[in-house]
Curated annotation (Swiss-Prot):
Organism: Alkaliphilus metalliredigens (strain QYMF)
Keyword list, A-Z: Cell cycle, Cell division, Cell membrane, Cell shape, Cell wall biogenesis/degradation, Magnesium, Membrane, Metal-binding, Peptidoglycan synthesis, Transferase, Transmembrane, Transmembrane helix
Pathway linked to the protein: Cell wall biogenesis; peptidoglycan biosynthesis
EC annotation from Swiss-Prot or TrEMBL: 2.7.8.13
Keyword Cell wall biogenesis/degradation attributed: yes
Sequence intervals crossing the membrane: 7-27, 54-74, 78-98, 106-126, 133-153, 154-174, 195-215, 249-269, 311-331
Catalytic function, reaction form: UDP-N-acetyl-alpha-D-muramoyl-L-alanyl-gamma-D-glutamyl-meso-2,6-diaminopimeloyl-D-alanyl-D-alanine + di-trans,octa-cis-undecaprenyl phosphate = di-trans,octa-cis-undecaprenyl diphospho-N-acetyl-alpha-D-muramoyl-L-alanyl-D-glutamyl-meso-2,6-diaminopimeloyl-D-alanyl-D-alanine + UMP
Family affiliation: Belongs to the glycosyltransferase 4 family. MraY subfamily.
InterPro entries from the UniProt entry: Glycosyl_transferase_4, PNAcMuramoyl-5peptid_Trfase, PNAcMuramoyl-5peptid_Trfase_CS
Pfam families attached to this UniProt entry: Glycos_transf_4 (PF00953)
Protein name: Phospho-N-acetylmuramoyl-pentapeptide-transferase
Signal peptide (from-to): none
SS bonds (residue pairs): none
Gene expressing this chain: mraY
Molecular-function annotations in GO: metal ion binding; phospho-N-acetylmuramoyl-pentapeptide-transferase activity; UDP-N-acetylmuramoyl-L-alanyl-D-glutamyl-meso-2,6-diaminopimelyl-D-alanyl-D-alanine:undecaprenyl-phosphate transferase activity
Amino acid sequence: MMNHNQIIYTIIIGFIITLILGPLTIPFLRRLKVGQTIREEGPKTHMAKSGTPTIGGIILIMSIIITSLTSGLINEELWIALAATVAFGIIGFIDDFIKVILKRNLGLRAYQKLILQGTIAVILAIYQSRTSIMGTEVIVPFVGEGITIAGFTITQTIDLGILYIPFIVFVVVATVNSVNLTDGLDGLAAGVTLIIAAFFALVAMSWGYVSLAIFAAAITGACLGFLKFNSHPAQVFMGDTGSLALGGAIATIAVLMNVVLIIPIVGGIYFAEAVSVILQVISFKLTGKRIFKMSPLHHHYELSGWAETKVVIVFWVVTVILCLVGMLALS
């Protein structure tokens, strides 16, 4: 049985490894001239970020892999989690490569990303449905041993049956792309994700998912170390390489623990960002008017006069609160 010390050690190791990898990787990215292109229609304060090296997600991925594999607590679940993280990271890397090295601003087309992401998600869903003792069941937050409302009983788990695979695919793909949308301010995606990863590390540890607890702790440490280079003013951006990898990692943990329904709660910031984009597009197409000054949501607050650092800190704090709610939801 693992204890809190192992989680703490893993976070510290991941943090140190990232601090070591950063100075080794960032100068290399600068020499490759993989600078970020900033949208002209974005906040004017962001124009100074133009040319900042991107594809920094490789630092995160390498740190997570090294930290996880040196833990001595390796099993099939850990390999699955690492494989999914790397696979989503590769999709992001291809997208970044096309945009910043081949200089094609659009990168992968949306349908290409969705096909690749969906394929990984299908494999993950099939694996879990066939190997988990819960089969196609998922845990329902907030109900404990079950509750009855107006004569209708809601049980602790719900069996999705044939809907399991499409549902898991939807949640995984939605999570991955929501994290990608969140990565728009210095330190935002890394900070939000380290908090959520810490939440999963604690839950996984208390539920006996030893390898997943280590994996989540490795993500926490990697993101914490990455903030040294990614907090305002950022020396490097994680790019799609990092955001898709982190989104895939968080989604995979939730799938393997059968708690995918907790993601919209603890990952509320992720989904607020995604929903803001969806609502903005729908509103503009139907009425010609925009709901937000700019989407994703973090840009709306920037254009409303909030400093970039204020938006980031507030979103971090909201995520801490949501993770505390998540703890109650799974208790």
